[in-house]
Each structure stands twice: as structure tokens, then as C-alpha cells.
UniProtKB/Swiss-Prot annotation:
CDD domains tied to this protein: MFS_Atg22_like
Transmembrane feature ranges: 95-115, 160-180, 193-213, 217-237, 320-340, 351-371, 412-432, 449-469, 484-504, 518-538, 557-577, 586-606
Name of the molecule in the record: Autophagy-related protein 22
Compartment(s) where it occurs, according to its Swiss-Prot or TrEMBL record: Vacuole membrane
Keywords carried by this UniProt record: Amino-acid transport, Autophagy, Glycoprotein, Membrane, Transmembrane, Transmembrane helix, Transport, Vacuole
Glycosylation sites: N311, N344
Organism: Chaetomium globosum (strain ATCC 6205 / CBS 148.51 / DSM 1962 / NBRC 6347 / NRRL 1970)
Disulfide bonds: none
Classification via Pfam families: ATG22
């Protein structure tokens, strides 16, 4: 670095080679895409002069409105990178899949209800192992005894049958998510896999129409397939979120207006071709431009841009959650109408699930039409294989990448803090929902239509929460992680309220502490309102911490943490039910698992995590940024990379 007092410091750089840009163009071919890369009618070339630095940011923005979507885009990071600005139609495609698939989560409570009903129809009382069990909605139907069913020669409580089924499904889901993460991050597979899993899951849900009393094991298999497909598809959907935000026109404009010295780019007028060549040797540019080694660095304005991206990501994520909840609320009302009209039989529950699957399949079509594939960098090994060999190569590389991603994540403090908290929090969310539904059905003896009303209230509150938490956080000046902490505090009310039933004086009242069916409804409102905030804020917060270029790989780690933890929660609750014969003791476990994530979330620093992620992105395949010698020699910037290089060289 040249000292400030050196007389050579004020000397301008040598005149650039006037036609070196065009010489560079001769070494590259313009990017072209087949129709499989395009979203409906948006088939504009992504190869532009602006990608090679010929057009200034100001001009590219002015031209973006004239019809070429490539102008104003960020420069490509790898061959085939789709750098077109995010369009309203592409966002609509992303929202469309949330509208299609979120109904599975919201209406999916009918699956454990149906599984418990089918298991109970095949079960016997534990007291004599001969007497058939009655309906769980009948307070006297089981004579107060536990009901068990034989599965593969093992005795299982019918209330825990669904819990074990979902534990198995999330275990398989975690393995599947790892295997497909590489195909999603590399090449043009992200969208294809999303649609494939969407339609596989929807068909599995529709097949419940054929599940009768004697096919309850088949019903459990369908639950595993549908839940696995749903989880895999949402990992792929979530991996689109950072890309949609990164290429959003608002972010591109913010990026173009930022220079390293913090001044607005509009303060420096673009030079025309002849003027620029005539004055190329004159020291007319500010010192910041002369010393700039990286046109995309945001040294003094990183916090502002990070905050803007996080806000936009939160808005898009929350809107997607809200749209999905609206779809679920409508379908819940339809489901309750079907249950009432068909007398609350298992047949009516199967019809409801068929409608849910059909909804999922039909509304996936708009996502297929409008969502762009946004391909990732090509995998070098895949060029040598085709067909099944290519799939094996992708799978092998995916598992190898997982261990590398874990190594990378270990160097990102805020990623590790978030994943640790999310491991516990996601388990609490999934386990609380299924435990509450089974508690209402088996302990409070609520009818299926009444259980449907729980979901309606929860969904309506979720819609309110999805659109209200952003206002609450702005009003109270809360950061993203502080909003998550507020949601956790409200969430803790649910298990603590269930534990009130153990207090002798509350038990003598015969009300409060979940002793009456109506008490489920206000708790459902709390659960929905909390989930509306957690779903959007956790997803967007994590997206801001991910190193650019590895969205699917890190969202696979996110899903493994999410779904992998859900293996333990339902299994532990199932073991508690088998040991105690009732569900209420499980609230002790839920109270602990809801509160434990709070200290980890509190320690997250978004700005620090974003900075570390960008530094680490340099060693992840498919992402390279040219840095100035000054920045390359900076010890702080190289600290993470040096440690990683040492590990990979071993």
C-alpha cells in the first residue's frame, strides 16, 4: 500500500487499454438458455454488455425499463448464472407454491387423527389384550383403559402410533434432503426437483382415499412419503429465497448506488465513450475510485445494505407464509363442512385428505409456469456421467459437500448459534402441534370437526401473525433475533398452561390447565400467532447468514437441523405416552424444549454473520470475487479461509 505522503500517491494510474473490454468479450460466449431455464414468457438473454463492465450501473438501470431484463443485473458469478432481476411473475411463482403446499402443514393434522383412528379400530385394550377399543371421541368407549395395536409384532399405544410414524418420516426426509442438495445447488435441477417432490407428495395424500381399516400400515407409509416429499420440496423452495432477494431490483439499485467510500454513485456522472478515452490519463476521479480494488465491496455501508436485504427477505418470507395460511384457512373451512356433512367418519377424513392432496397438485402448476430455475454452478464431475451415473455422482458429491458444509458452518459463529437454537425450536414447533391434537382427541375426547376448528383458529391467528410481527418489530424497534425471542416467550405459555392441570386446586376447579375442550381454542390462537412470526423471521434471518452461492447446501443443513431434531421430539413424546399411559406428562418435555433455544438466539449478530459468510464464500465452489492486494493481505479477512484451507489439505 502506498503511503499517503508519498509523492507518487497522487499520480493517476496508467491509461487503460482502450479496447481491452472488447478483447475480453472475444474470450467469452454470450450465455444462452433453452426454454427449460425460462419462466413462462420471460425469455430474454442474460448475456449483456453490462455483465462485462461495458455499461455503467446508471445506464443499466435506465435501460432496464426499456425491455431488457438483463440490464441492471448483477454480474454473473459462474457460467450459466441467471442474473436477471427478480420479476413480479417470478415472485408470484414462489408464492404460488406456498399457496399450494402450505395446506399440507395446516390441514395435515388430519393425518395423525386418521392414523390414530385406524390404529384404534385395529387395537385392543391393554388390560386383557382381547377387547376391541372403542372410539377415542367416546369418553366411555375404551372403559378408561389404554388401547394398543400390534405393529411388526410390537405393542404400541394407538396414541403414539402417529408420533412414531412421523419420527420415521423426518429421519428419511433428512437423509433425502442431503442427497438432493447438491443437485439443487449445481446445474438446472432446483426447480425440477421442487416440482417432482410437490407432485409426489400430493399424490400420496390423495391416495388416502383408498386407505381402509385393514390398510392402516399403508396409511402410515403414505404419511412417510407425503411428509418426506413436503419437507424436501420446501427445502428447495427456501433455497430460492436468498436468490430472489439478491436479484431483486431494489437490492440491485442499492448495490449500484454504493461505493467503498460511502458516497452515492449518482454523485459521479458516467463518462461517454469519447470523453472517457480522451480523459483517461487525467486525475479527475476521486481517490476512493483509484484505490478501489473491488467494485462490489461495501466497506463503510455494509450495515445499511444488510439491513435492507434482511427487511426485504423478511417481507417476502412473511408474505409467503401469510399466503399459505390463507389457503389453509379456506381449506380448513371446506374440511369442517365435509366432516359435518359426512358424520365425522374415517371415510370423511379420507375425503378431506384427498381434497388437500388435489389442492396441492393443482396449485403447483402456476409455480411450474412462473418460477425461474435459477441454476447453480455446474458440477465438474457431472459432465462425465449421464442418467443414473450422474445421479449417483450428485448424491456422492452431496454427502461429501455436507461434511464440507458442516466444516464451513463450524467457522461461522452465528450460523452455529442459529442452527443450535433452530434444532430445539423446530422440534418444539412440530412436537407441540401433534401432541396437542392427540391430547385433544384422546384426553379431551373432541370430535374431528372440533379438531378442525382448532386448526381454523390457529390458521387465522397465523395469518394475523405473519402480517403483524413485522409491524410489531418496527413499532418496538426490535431486531430480527429479538422478534424471534418475543415469539418464544409467547410460545412458552402453551406447555406451561398444560402443566397447570397438575396443580391440586386447579384440578379441583375442573377448568383451566386443559381440562375442558374449549381451552384448546385460545391456545390454538397463541400457537398460530407465534408460528406466523417464527416461520418468516427464522427463514429470512438464516438466509442472511448463508454464504452466497451455497443456498441449497446450507438450507439442506437447515432442513436437517429442522427435521432431524423432529425425529427426537415425537419419539420422546411417544415413549412418555407408552410409559405413563397419558399425554399430559409430555408437557414437561415441551416446556423445556421451547425455552432452551432463547439463549442461543439472543447471541446472534446478523452483521457479523453476514460478513463472515461473504468471506467464506470465496472458498465455496462457484463463487469467486476479485479482491485488491490490500484486502487479500488483511489478516482478519483471511482468518476463516486459512483455517479451512488447513483442514482440506489434510
Amino acid at each position: 500500500m502506498v503511503p499517503r505522503n508519498d509523492p507518487e500517491a497522487g499520480r493517476p494510474p496508467l491509461a487503460p487499454r482502450l479496447f481491452s473490454r472488447f478483447s475480453q468479450l472475444s474470450k467469452h460466449s454470450f450465455l444462452s438458455y433453452s426454454s427449460s431455464f425460462e419462466a413462462d414468457d420471460e425469455r430474454s438473454s442474460t448475456g449483456s454488455l453490462e455483465n462485462f463492465g461495458i455499461m455503467s450501473p446508471g445506464r443499466s438501470r435506465s435501460n432496464s425499463g426499456s425491455g431488457s431484463s438483463s440490464f441492471g443485473a448483477l454480474p454473473p458469478r459462474y457460467p450459466g448464472d441467471d442474473t436477471r432481476p427478480t420479476s413480479p411473475k417470478e415472485l408470484a411463482g414462489w408464492y404460488a407454491y406456498a399457496f399450494a403446499a402450505e395446506v399440507y402443514v395446516i390441514c395435515g393434522s388430519f393425518i395423525p387423527i386418521l392414523l390414530e383412528s385406524l390404529a384404534r379400530e385395529n387395537g385392543v385394550l391393554l388390560s386383557d389384550r382381547k377387547t376391541p377399543c372403542g372410539s377415542s371421541s367416546d369418553k366411555n368407549g375404551d372403559n378408561g383403559g389404554q388401547c394398543i395395536v400390534y405393529v411388526l409384532g410390537m405393542e404400541i399405544n394407538t396414541a403414539s402410533f402417529a408420533m412414531y410414524t412421523f419420527s420415521i418420516s423426518v429421519l428419511i426426509q433428512a437423509l433425502l434432503v442431503v442427497s438432493i442438495s447438491c443437485a439443487a445447488d449445481h446445474g438446472n435441477y432446483r426447480k425440477k426437483l421442487l416440482l417432482a417432490f410437490g407432485w409426489i407428495g400430493s399424490i400420496a395424500v390423495m391416495l388416502y382415499i383408498f386407505v381402509s381399516k385393514n390398510l392402516y400400515i399403508f396409511g402410515a407409509l403414505l404419511a412417510i412419503v407425503s411428509n418426506t416429499s413436503f419437507g424436501a420440496s420446501f427445502v428447495l423452495l427456501n433455497s430460492f429465497l436468498p436468490l430472489l432477494v439478491r436479484h431483486h431490483p431494489e437490492i440491485i439499485d442499492k448495490e449500484a448506488n454504493i461505493v467503498p467510500n460511502g458516497q452515492d454513485a449518482q454523485d459521479h456522472e458516467d463518462l461517454d465513450g469519447e470523453t472517457a478515452m480522451a480523459d483517461s490519463t487525467a486525475a479527475l476521479l476521486p481517490r476512493g475510485s483509484l484505490e478501489d480494488g473491488n467494485a462490489l465491496s461495501r466497506v463503510q455501508t455494509r450495515e445499511e445494505l444488510t439491513s435492507h436485504e434482511l427487511n426485504l427477505s423478511t417481507q417476502v418470507s412473511a408474505k409467503g407464509i401469510g399466503i399459505g395460511y390463507i389457503a389453509g384457512l379456506f381449506l380448513q373451512c371446506v374440511a369442517i363442512f365435509i366432516l359435518i356433512q359426512m358424520k365425522n367418519t374415517t371415510w370423511s377424513q379420507r375425503v378431506v385428505l384427498f381434497v388437500i392432496g388435489a389442492w396441492w397438485a393443482i396449485f403447483t402448476v402456476p409455480a411450474a409456469m412462473w418460477l425461474r430455475p435459477r441454476p447453480g454452478p455446474p458440477l465438474p464431475a457431472s459432465s462425465r456421467h449421464t442418467g443414473i451415473r450422474a445421479f449417483i455422482a450428485y448424491t456422492f458429491y452431496a454427502w461429501k459437500s455436507l461434511f464440507r458444509t458442516v466444516q464451513l458452518a463450524r467457522r461461522l459463529v452465528d450460523i452455529m448459534l442459529f442452527l443450535g437454537g433452530w434444532f430445539l425450536l423446530s422440534d418444539a414447533i412440530a412436537t407441540t402441534s401433534s401432541t396437542a391434537i392427540l391430547f385433544a382427541k384422546t384426553q379431551l375426547h373432541m370430535e374431528p370437526w372440533a379438531l378442525g376448528m382448532i386448526n381454523v383458529i390457529s390458521t387465522a391467528a397465523g395469518i394475523t401473525g405473519a402480517f403483524s410481527w413485522s409491524y410489531i418489530s418496527r413499532r418496538l424497534h426490535l431486531q430480527a433475533h429479538q422478534t424471534i425471542l418475543a415469539c418464544i416467550a409467547l410460545f412458552e405459555i402453551i406447555p406451561l398452561y398444560g402443566l397447570l392441570g397438575y396443580l391440586p386446586f386447579v384440578k379441583n376447579w375442573g377448568v383451566f390447565g386443559l381440562q375442558q375442550p374449549w381451552e384448546m381454542y385460545p391456545l390454538a390462537a397463541v400457537y398460530g400467532f407465534v408460528l406466523g412470526g417464527l416461520s418468516g423471521y427464522c427463514r429470512s434471518l438464516y438466509g442472511e447468514l448463508i454464504p452466497p452461492g451455497s443456498e441449497a447446501a446450507f438450507y439442506a443443513l437447515y432442513a436437517i437441523t429442522d427435521k432431524g431434531s423432529s425425529v427426537f421430539g415425537p419419539a420422546i413424546v411417544g415413549a412418555i405416552i407408552d410409559a405413563s399411559g397419558e399425554i399430559r406428562p409430555a408437557f414437561w418435555f415441551l416446556a423445556a424444549i421451547v425455552g432452551l433455544p432463547a439463549p442461543l438466539i439472543w447471541c446472534i449478530n446478523v452483521e457479523r454473520g453476514r460478513s463472515e459468510g461473504e468471506k467464506l464464500a470465496e472458498v465455496i465452489e462457484g463463487f469467486k470475487v476479485t479482491r485488491s492486494p490490500e484486502r487479500e493481505s488483511d489478516e482478519e479477512s483471511r482468518a476463516i479461509l486459512d483455517v479451512y484451507d488447513e483442514e482440506t489439505d489434510r
